[in-house]
Amino acid sequence: MSIDDKYYILRFNAFKAHHDIKEGGMNLNQKRQLIKLLEQYGKVFITTEKEIDPEFERYRIPIKPYEMHNFLAFSQMLVSDSQTMSSEAAVLGIPSFRCNTFAGRLSILEEEEKRYGLTYGYLPRQFEWMLEAIERVLQDTEAKAKWEIKRNRMLEDKIDVTAFWIWFIDNYPESVKEVKAKDFDFGRFK
């Protein structure tokens, strides 16, 4: 691969955690449709928590887990049935689409979607709508720049968590009392 190659990441969740009971994501046919669409625009890579379907083995990401965020940061898009990686892509300014039964129910992803337009969630029965939305972004030559603007807007609204924790630890135990005060100003950590 060269630095100029366009690539897309698919992330498939195992849905084996206790909170995943009766939850699910994309089926095999939907995954096939997704790959067929994305391959028209560049390379497709798959990362998965579960055993990869044999027909998708050739798409497996050939990287170590600790390299994932760097790989994600330079991708064109993430399509997933995983909440965590969808949010991570959003924070990196990478267009992300997720399709699972959690869509519309998780506050952080809802904020990233409704307030900032960084990620989009669809139920499995809305898969065709998701494909249409993905295609619109794929055809938008300014998508990367637009997502960078959205990302910067989101980051401007948030505090610097590292600065907060450094202050909190350096000033412990008084910092606990300050944070619990009704008039505590988190804005000073922007």
Specify the residue positions occupied by each region the protein language model found.
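Nucleotide-activated sugar donor-binding and catalytic core shared by glycosyltransferases
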Residues: 1-41, 51-190
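Short internal beta-strands
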Residues: 45-48
